Amino acid sequence: MASLKALRGRITSVKSTQKITSAMKMVAASKLRRAQQAAEAARPYAELMQRMLAALADNVAGSPSAPRILVGTGQDKVHLLVVISADRGLAGAFNTNVGRAARTLANRLESEGKTVKILTVGRKARDYLRRDLETRLLPETSLAGKKVLAFADALALSQQITARLDAGEFDVCTLVYNHFNSVISQTPGETQLIPAQVPQAAPADAGASSNGAKAVYEFEPDEETLLAKLLPQNLAIQIYRAILESAAGEHAARMTAMDNATRNAGDMIKRLSLTYNRTRQANITRELIEIISGAEAL
């Protein structure tokens, strides 16, 4: 049985840890509100951009001069995975889940005979993937280590991806990140960036009238010029949206993890306090028995 001094030390240590986890929970909750608002504000803009591209892409996709971001290279040999994670831990399985999803996707692609390259945003994804896929990791992780990622950072990353596409370094680019569903639910998912997966235009966007006739629009400048401008912007927007979703998911996961840690610390303090009191009572009882036995011996 542990001594009273050791038990007091453990109780003090756990109480100190409980204060830290409680403070981290409150900080994560504060950051979550801001991150959630930013993620929700970005969704309508990103969705509207997709609708706009859908209205333009129908007439351009089959053109030999269509932008490469839209149609890709025409091959499916080399895949670039852009994996977004956090720089910090203490967020439950948040980073492990996205790292596992990226590893599963990479292994599946390689089993199909494809070459995989990985660009990570966030230290935790890089640390996780280095164990099994170190040779596939690209050296640049320019966004890792930043406390706050702005749209300019997403734009810089999209420009880096576009430059690699123009250099012929990959054929398909896929974004892997944690979708923010709710405070208690963040699920890893994939979004293909290149070739751009533009949704089918809705009838109103495509210019279809109520009698089935399709309206013809004239664009100034032409569709290809507009797409050449909009597609890089859309690439940056989709990356930024994923960064915001991942940030909101990270803070939610950390808040939940710290809440669980605080509760567990409270339970441990109760158990240790009970053990301490029982040990103290046992020591008092033993001392009383020794005193009584000594008195009887006299």
Curated annotation (Swiss-Prot):
Keywords: ATP synthesis, Cell inner membrane, Cell membrane, CF(1), Hydrogen ion transport, Ion transport, Membrane, Transport. It is a peripheral membrane protein. PROSITE patterns: ATPASE_GAMMA (PS00153). CDD domains: F1-ATPase_gamma (cd12151). One of its GO terms (biological process) is proton motive force-driven plasma membrane ATP synthesis. Its main location: membrane. The keyword Cell inner membrane applies. Pfam families: ATP-synt. InterPro entries: ATP_synth_F1_ATPase_gsu (IPR035968), ATP_synth_F1_gsu (IPR000131), ATP_synth_F1_gsu_CS (IPR023632). One of its GO terms (molecular function) is ATP binding. Produces ATP from ADP in the presence of a proton gradient across the membrane. The gamma chain is believed to be important in regulating ATPase activity and the flow of protons through the CF(0) complex. F-type ATPases have 2 components, CF(1) - the catalytic core - and CF(0) - the membrane proton channel. CF(1) has five subunits: alpha(3), beta(3), gamma(1), delta(1), epsilon(1). CF(0) has three main subunits: a, b and c. NCBIfam families: ATPsyn_F1gamma, PRK05621.1-4. This is ATP synthase gamma chain. It comes from Granulibacter bethesdensis (strain ATCC BAA-1260 / CGDNIH1).
